[in-house]
Amino acid sequence: MKEKIVIALGGNAIQTKEATAEAQQTAIRRAMQNLKPLFDSPARIVISHGNGPQIGSLLIQQAKSNSDTTPAMPLDTCGAMSQGMIGYWLETEINRILTEMNSDRTVGTIVTRVEVDKDDPRFNNPTKPIGPFYTKEEVEELQKEQPDSVFKEDAGRGYRKVVASPLPQSILEHQLIRTLADGKNIVIACGGGGIPVIKKENTYEGVEAVIDKDFASEKLATLIEADTLMILTNVENVFINFNEPNQQQIDDIDVATLKKYAAQGKFAEGSMLPKIEAAIRFVESGENKKVIITNLEQAYEALIGNKGTHIHM
């Protein structure tokens, strides 16, 4: 099992009712125990992860402490903060496991920038809510300072800022990530979908956006020529007609059939559909590519073919 694998961790890997650092580290410790058999295998491993709750907390902290002396940091910088924070937690727990196994593998985090197209039409239709809730009066004041920002009412709970979710075009650090992964290193990258940047003259500039982590993980897997993209979520298998009387579990499926189901609206938008779309793109990116969708607990069993949904040409 010497294949190269990108493991896209779902938010449930760090999910906890408590928002303290200690509670989140405990959740990560439990999560990484499920991946221990993979760390003990010859597989070359890159791990991506979500950051929704963590960046949400960071943005609230920024808003509450914003002043002339402690100005709030922008979204792209908060994304970098969350990558470092979660990467540190993951490194700590993975290193603990590697030490217990007397492994000579190492683990490290790459703060990852993801290039997006400044002309992506998704910039004209911001949909991703971020940060704290505001009253209507607070929004009116904020828009005097941020005339280009968009705020939307959120299910009667107040108003939230919404930002675009452009498609990833490239992963700027992909060559470095590939070099590290092709050694004995376990690499943590593309946290929270990566930091969105646009090309500007001879450099890159951060933009206020959120990249879907499944799309970013697919782009990373393609660029580093991974063999397998494993998307870990909160269900053991993909289902068509999920949570309906006629739901049907999928164990093994080809891309052509998967496309047909997606076109028929068999997968929920905003939850399973992006994972399906990312899976299709990756499988079609080269020969003998496969995608596994399952939950964290079944990750190793899915990798050896016993569990999960397996997607291929």
Curated annotation (Swiss-Prot):
One of its GO terms (biological process) is arginine deiminase pathway. SUPFAM superfamilies: Carbamate kinase-like. This is Carbamate kinase 2. GO terms for molecular function: ATP binding; carbamate kinase activity. One of its GO terms (cellular component) is cytosol. Its EC number is 2.7.2.2. It holds the Pfam family AA_kinase. Keywords: Arginine metabolism, ATP-binding, Cytoplasm, Kinase, Nucleotide-binding, Transferase. It comes from Staphylococcus aureus (strain Mu50 / ATCC 700699). It catalyses: hydrogencarbonate + NH4(+) + ATP = carbamoyl phosphate + ADP + H2O + H(+). It is found in: Cytoplasm. InterPro entries: AceGlu_kinase-like_sf (IPR036393), Asp/Glu/Uridylate_kinase (IPR001048), Carb_kinase (IPR003964). Belongs to the carbamate kinase family.
